[in-house]
Amino acid sequence: KLVGRRKGEPSEVVAQRVLKARMLQKQRFADDGIFTNAEMNNRLLEKHCQLNDECRKVMELLISRLGLSARAYSRILKVARTIADLEMSRDIRPEYLREAASYRFLDRLNLETFG
C-alpha cells in the first residue's frame, strides 16, 4: 500500500495523482534527457534524493539488516523518490524509504517462492 492511501480510493483519484507525479518528473528531468525517476544515474540520485539525518539513519539500518548492495540502495532511493512524488512531497521521508524497502523485500520473497 502506498503511504497515505485509503482502501477503496477511486481509480480516477489515483490516476490523477500518477499523472501529476509523471508531470513533476518530466519537469525535474527536462534538461537531463530522461523522463522518470527510474532512469536516474548516480549524479541525479545525489541531486534529487538527498536524505536528512533521520532518513540516513533509516537507510543505514536497512543496509545493515537487509545487506543491501549499492544497486539495491539506488533502487530503494528511486522508489522512495517516486512515492514522495505521488504524495507531492518535496522531500523523501523515512516512511517512504521503509515502504520502498518493503517492496524490495516482497520482490525477493516472490523470487524465492516462485522463482
Q: Can you name each region flagged by the protein language model?
A:
Residues 1-113:
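Basic, amphipathic alpha-helical bundle interface domains used for macromolecular binding and assembly
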